[in-house]
């Protein structure tokens, strides 16, 4: 089903991988890419549960936009182990203007396809999505 705003469809694999992350915890992160020629959002990369946040951050291109899901494990002040699912809209300042516009206009529709996102983060620079930022958003 294409998005009226940008004409982008969401590939079924996007939802399937998200459900695997959410329900089975078989992935630490998922990076999604818009394939403009095919007019759809696709899965670009899936990270194993053993991978670190640094591995995830390194998988995002420095000069291109992406959507990403990150399963963030943390310990509360009460010493409880918890997890939050982050949606990260990665849109670096140096990305092409057309790409930024397509990702911005498709974001809300894409997010609606992924039921279970708990925290949303938008980042134009790596410092806007470092571990300290994630930690501050879960409290």
Curated annotation (Swiss-Prot):
GO molecular function annotation: actin binding
Q: Which InterPro entries match?
A: ADF-H, ADF-H/Gelsolin-like_dom_sf, ADF/Cofilin
Q: Which UniProt keywords apply?
A: Actin-binding, Cytoplasm, Cytoskeleton, Phosphoprotein, Plant defense
Post-translation changes: Phosphorylation at Ser-6 is required for resistance to Pseudomonas syringae pv tomato AvrPphB.
Which GO terms of the cellular component aspect does the record hold? actin cytoskeleton; cytosol; plastid
Q: Which family does it belong to?
A: Belongs to the actin-binding proteins ADF family.
Q: What is this protein called?
A: Actin-depolymerizing factor 4
> Which species is the source of this protein?
Arabidopsis thaliana (Mouse-ear cress)
Gene name of the encoded protein: ADF4
